[in-house]
């Protein structure tokens, strides 16, 4: 706690525990005592959309099998109640109307249920037009079967067309770096669109998670900007973008960098973009731990020229970092104070905090 004599105990966000958000954007938080049963099933559509494909296929296959079995039982019960099971269907009594021809066992009833749902015509087994119960049951099965097929088809289309799938083509650098831009330290990361189709209206936001006051998580917004673009949105995302956060005294990261062993924190980065073809918004997430922030490094160049003068993106250099050249020392001014910054056990460097930011 800031400005307090109480010792902060923070056992949750430590490096021996898993990160809250994985590098590919999935949450690792587990909900104890969350709602279950009917309250959980109210969002059945959302549950299906979040399922993995193998479980979704299993659920849909089981739905069809259960549908066929339920109506097989109903057709069998109808045949038994009508007295059709023990009859010779080729020579029935003159005063007896067979509801469904040749249903003499449960296997035959299941076969008829399957045939009713999946075909447009009947073979040797067919319902009699003189049996109202058979016609009513046939109509009910067809209606429920069409509803089930429509629901499953819609779920497949919705899952395939989700914007989430487009987000998988957005790639963040595995590491972030702290480098000097115009003599001022900046936290930098890169993001790339690995598909040739562009994204528009790109927005980046970040949240710094720290544990304070005996296990309570504290969230702080961290602002990033893109080169010299004054707008919060990048209108066109086709080549790798580099985002910067200026480490000035008001930055939530400035105080964290003053420790030889910085307290554990997690910086979660969110990128939202709009698909040009559909207008749908997709989001990609990643996170950076203190061990994934490289001090006095910069990213390798990604752009090159081809033989015809066209731009080429060297994705093999995407995660490569190189040590930056040390900037000459700046004379102290009355408005600057010295502090030592240590990250991940790297070399100890002397910086000065001024009104314009950290300078070496």
Curated annotation (Swiss-Prot):
Can you tell which superkingdom this protein's organism belongs to? Answer: Eukaryota
Q: Where are the transmembrane segments?
A: 51-77, 132-157
Name the UniProt key words of this record, in alphabetical order.
Cell membrane, Ion channel, Ion transport, Membrane, Phosphoprotein, Potassium, Potassium transport, Transmembrane, Transmembrane helix, Transport, Voltage-gated channel
Ranges facing Cytoplasmic side: 1-50, 158-360
Q: Which reaction does it catalyse?
A: K(+)(in) = K(+)(out)
Protein location: Membrane; Cell membrane
Is Cell membrane there in the keyword field?
yes
Q: Which GO terms describe its molecular function?
A: inward rectifier potassium channel activity
* UniProt xrefs under Pfam families: IRK (PF01007), IRK_C (PF17655)
* GO BP term, pick one: regulation of monoatomic ion transmembrane transport
Question: What is known about regulation of its activity?
Answer: Inhibited by Ba(2+) and Cs(+), although sensitivity to those inhibitors is much lower than in other Kir channels.
How is this protein annotated for GO cellular component?
Answer: monoatomic ion channel complex; plasma membrane
Tell me the InterPro entries matching this sequence: Ig_E-set, IRK_C, K_chnl_inward-rec_Kir, K_chnl_inward-rec_Kir_cyto, KCNJ13, Kir_TM
**Modification Phosphoserine, positions:** 287
Q: Fill in the PTM field for this protein.
A: Phosphorylation at Ser-287 by PKA increases them.
Can the keyword Repeat be found in this entry's annotation?
Answer: no
Q: Where is this site: Role in the control of polyamine-mediated channel gating and in the blocking by intracellular magnesium?
A: 149
| Residue ranges annotated as Extracellular topological domain | 78-105, 123-131
- Protein's membrane topology: Multi-pass membrane protein
Q: Where are this protein's intramembrane segments? A: 106-122
Similarity comment: Belongs to the inward rectifier-type potassium channel (TC 1.A.2.1) family.
PANTHER family, A to Z: INWARD RECTIFIER POTASSIUM CHANNEL, INWARD RECTIFIER POTASSIUM CHANNEL 13
Under which name does UniProt file this protein? Inward rectifier potassium channel 13
The scientific name of the source species is Bos taurus
Q: What is the name of the gene encoding this protein?
A: KCNJ13
